[in-house]
Amino acid sequence: MARNKPLAKKLRLAKAAKQNRRVPVWVIVKTNRKVMTHPKRRHWRRTKLKE
């Protein structure tokens, strides 16, 4: 990936990085472990973003 990125691409990558987090612990506790997995979780090597 280029060091000099266009701002729009940088913002898209930042949004994807923020979305790619685990389910918060308080949600797991509140739902009695019914909600454990995050369906939109993305692994950097397996699933690539559209750029």
Curated annotation (Swiss-Prot):
Q: Which GO terms describe its molecular function?
A: structural constituent of ribosome
Q: Name one GO biological process term.
A: translation
Entry annotated with the keyword GTP-binding: no
Q: Which GO terms describe its cellular component?
A: cytosolic large ribosomal subunit
The answer to whether keyword Ribonucleoprotein applies is yes
Concerning InterPro entries, the annotation shows: Ribosomal_eL39, Ribosomal_eL39_CS, Ribosomal_eL39_dom_sf
State the similarity comment.
Belongs to the eukaryotic ribosomal protein eL39 family.
Protein's recorded name? Large ribosomal subunit protein eL39
Q: Can you name the source organism? A: Thermococcus gammatolerans (strain DSM 15229 / JCM 11827 / EJ3)
Provide the taxonomic classification: Archaea, Methanobacteriati, Methanobacteriota, Thermococci, Thermococcales
